[in-house]
Amino acid sequence: YIILPTERPPLYARTCSFSCVRAYGLEIKASGKINIGVFSDKNPFGYVDENGEYQGYDIYFANRLGKDLGVEINYVSTEAANRVEYLETGKVDIILANFTVTEERAEKVDFALPYMNVALGVVSPDSNVITSLDNWKAENKMIVISGTTAELYLTKNYPDIKLQKYDSYATAKSAIENGNGVAWANDNTEVIAFAKQNKGYTVGIDSLGSQDTIAPAVSKGNETLLNWINDEIKTLGKENFFHADYDATLTDTYGADYKETLVVEGGEVKKS
């Protein structure tokens, strides 16, 4: 069939040639590449392996997007605090970097349908496990990564807690290991992974605040790309794609127990 400039290709066309991408009006370089912002140090979601290849839950999804768009992916390493900026400045077309949907962020970027559930969690050394924030000692510091939901939540809801802020997952990880704070607050998926991968730490609080979702994000007003991603997520749900993604990238860290808790299939969040 011939795709006219105003016509959207049918969802059964699983591989979309670059001409098809242009039919969506997407501003992707004529070279046939799409720039996707991901983490490079956040195993098992987005990280660079020993061979210099990007791996993880977000990467598995990104690879499928590139395949179905029919374009090459240019991965752009990002930190949490840069995710909005990279979209606003056009450095990336999509952010797939454990991006929690919040009202504040939605004022600056457009979120697609979700693909994972998340809450906040707090990890601390076994020698002093933090199980509550209600009796926080004034001299203690909480480690957070700048630009994360954890920083925003604690600043708003626990203003008396001193925050020790770091720019990246790697530096925050080093900080808790070096005792620069009594605990580390981050997405519960990430602190659970940290505790499982590093002996001597316990997630004393595994669900802090509200239950949220993680979703792809595009620049504000980029409806063509947003609509394509939403259609793609719905279609992938029919093949249980994100369950397969979990099996391939997260099972070694979380086991099978967390699968139904974390995975969102087809963009539909199940009511608990």
Regions found by a protein language model. Name each.
Residues 116-126, 188, 192-233, 252-271:
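Periplasmic-binding protein-like
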Residues 124-142:
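Flexible hinge/capping segments at coil-to-helix
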